[in-house]
Amino acid sequence: MALCCFAFSAPCLHLRSRRSCSSCFLRAKSAAFSSARFLRRAFSSSFLFKYSAICFSSSFSRSFFRFLFSSARRCRSRCVSPRGGAFPPGGPRRSRPRLSSSRDSKPSSTVSSSSLSFNSSSKDNSPSTNSSTSRSSGHGTGKHRNSPTDTKLTMLIISPLPRVWTESSFRIPSLRVWRLCTRRLVPHLWGTMFGPPTSSRPTGHLSRASDHLGPHRWTRYRLSSTVPYPSTPLLPHPENL
């Protein structure tokens, strides 16, 4: 774009002939169009989806993703008002958070609770903010939704979890929650794509046959040998009667 503006605004430096001037202009124009095409390709969804595995494969990329997520959360907390709508063009008014009273119990309180639960790991965890969040969420004296455990669960659900993350080099504190979610939501993938190897699983579970026998087997599931209930008793052979 800078080259295109330079070609439009700056005087022609090559005054030898009109042909050289037009070739310089066409070269700048083609360079500007190629740079715009590259930017359009770089921000397309297919380009980002193609390189998403590379982005989440290294620790630097994971920290960069966390930085992007926190900056987006900070931008959302600045640009979204506590009532759920956008601020006026003059900018947000610098005022203290007002506690919601009984007169303000309107349907917009649910919107404010959902927008505040998105910013659950913000650094402003003062008691007044926590009390206003718990009151506006409508749960009364229960635990407010602005807790760091909700943030961990949200991050685990929306972020991909390749097999490299489950190794001992990268430990997640609440990996048990992720195992429970994947076992309940996608049980047909449990054992092939997600989760640790079979030796570290709890005893008495219904494991996948492909974990032990390979993916191409007729039997779909296999009961573990340490199931809490007894198996079918063997019928006696006729020669032993």
From Swiss-Prot:
Residues 107-138 have a biased composition (Low complexity). The keyword Repressor applies. It comes from the Viruses. It holds the Pfam family Deltaretro_Tax. A motif (Mitochondrial targeting signal) lies at residues 175-184. InterPro entries: P30II (IPR008596). Residues 86-153 are annotated as: Disordered. A motif (Nuclear localization signal 1) lies at residues 73-78. The keyword Signal does not apply. GO terms for cellular component: host cell mitochondrial inner membrane; host cell nucleolus; membrane. Keywords: Apoptosis, Host membrane, Host mitochondrion, Host mitochondrion inner membrane, Host nucleus, Membrane, Repressor, Transcription, Transcription regulation. A motif (Nuclear localization signal 2) lies at residues 91-98. HTLV-1 lineages are divided in four clades, A (Cosmopolitan), B (Central African group), C (Melanesian group) and D (New Central African group). Belongs to the HTLV-1 accessory protein p30II family. p30II is a multifunctional regulator that sequesters EP300/CREBBP and down-regulates CREB-responsive element (CRE) and Tax-responsive element (TRE) mediated transcription. Specifically binds and represses tax/rex mRNA nuclear export. Since Tax and Rex are positive regulators of viral gene expression, their inhibition by p30II reduces virion production, and allows the virus to escape the host immune surveillance and persist latently in an immune-competent host. p13II increases mitochondrial permeability to monovalent cations, producing a rapid, membrane potential-dependent influx of potassium. This could involve a channel-forming activity. Interferes with cell proliferation and transformation and promotes apoptosis induced by ceramide and Fas ligand, probably using the Ras signaling. p30II binds to the KIX domains of CREBBP and EP300. This is Accessory protein p30II. It comes from Human T-cell leukemia virus 1 (isolate Caribbea HS-35 subtype A) (HTLV-1). The lineage of its organism: Viruses, Riboviria, Pararnavirae, Artverviricota, Revtraviricetes.
